[in-house]
Amino acid sequence: MFFACGHNGQRTTSEDGIHWSSPVFGKEGEVYRTAAAGPGEIVCIGRFGGQNITAASKDGATWKLGGNDAKYKDYIQGVTYGNGTFLALGGDPGSVGVGDPFVMLSSDGESWSSIVKTSGKFILRRAVWGNGMWVGVGDRGRRAASRDGKVWEDAPKVKAIDTLVDIAFGNDIFVGVGLHGLRMTSRDGITWENRQTGIEGEHLNSILWADHRFVAVGLGGTWTSSDGVTWDRKENQNAPLTAAYARGSFIGAHWRGRLLHSTDAIQWKEVFKSEQHFEAVAAV
């Protein structure tokens, strides 16, 4: 199943990434900003005023809504799934100098733990499970690893210029991507190598492990690699701001309210349009 969520509580699903259901809406002002999927469960997370809001569904039709008091500072920034667990990452996006990072965990996407404050100065925004660990990337170049999602070890001596905006795992390696075509690899989330950059201004917004290769999608170019070291770049058309992959299909979202589909992550076609913008897409 493919799904997308966004502004005014908007949620929609698709079996093939091409034909989408009529959106379900929430309250005006609700914004779902991140999404993840596990076996038999899809989850959207966002904010409404001073609240974190969650929406979980097994079929895309019936949703269980929830949330917690963010106190206008403990906002969830990202969510991912791995090892039978949904992991939500957050912190204070308005802080100066320290992000006050935290995590929340759930086995089903519906019932969540209380906020668990974690070490580190800056927020982790994206994470992936692989090799028996979580590896997360976040603000000001932060990169960290955790066995349980609660206790994190940071990579040393990181630089803000090397901020990674997304991360994927495949072929026994973690690969992160970022601004100006930045790509880096790691075996353990602590030691990073093979730093490469691309074209100035061509930011890589998403990286996916798709059909035995890494696929990094940016506005202008799509990069592919089997090992995270040797890459091939092709100019893309109509590329999305965020992307997901499953069963031979790539989906993505772009301003405003556009859902896109592709079979190669290079040629993208608009397949759905809404008056409300989609912030996140995911697939299972």
Model-found features: residue ranges?
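Residue-level hotspots at or immediately adjacent to binding/recognition sites across diverse folds
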Residues: 1-284
